[in-house]
Amino acid sequence: KTTFTVGKSFNIALIVIAVTLYSVTTYAADNKATRHVSALLDLIDNSLNYSKEAPNDSIIQWGNELAPLLKKQKEYKTLFQLKQLIVTAYASRGDMNMAIDHARRMYKEAKELNSPIGIALSSRAIGDAYLNANMQEPAIESYKEALELLDKIPGSEILEQEILPKFILTLIQTSHMDEVRIYLQKFENLYADNP
């Protein structure tokens, strides 16, 4: 009977240890995931491409882990802002083919979801990827598409303000001076309305 009691006590102790370890591990994993999501959302909210807390490789990994959840919850604006961040991370580490490929897949997904904001952000991502690959003319076309779509989406003025400076600079570099004037005026108007 003593052996049974010792064995039973030992089993109970093992279960308590296992539950404790599981709880600690689950808490640590949840806490880590929360920190990752928080770091990515900080980047999106502050229009940053990376930070000390979220270097390029981490952005790619965490973003790919978080994207299915955002898609499932139909958080399309945040989903495509996150995917834009992933494209930028690929480009920042010099992987232009991956950046362009990811941006194109992003565009296809946005079309399949029939998400205007997703299509606009995907067009922007394609423009950014092309610009980073020194392909200015295709970048210009992608930026134009993004801006045309964003014009039709209420509340997207901040996104337009983020695109316009590099778009205008690209127009200047490629000698599209008539368009520069048009988009400079647009930028001034947007900035006056949303300082």
Walk through the language-model features, giving the residues of each.
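Bacterial N-terminal signal peptides that target proteins for export
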Residues: 2-13
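Bacterial N-terminal signal peptides
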Residues: 11-22
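A "functional boundary" signal
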Residues: 26-195
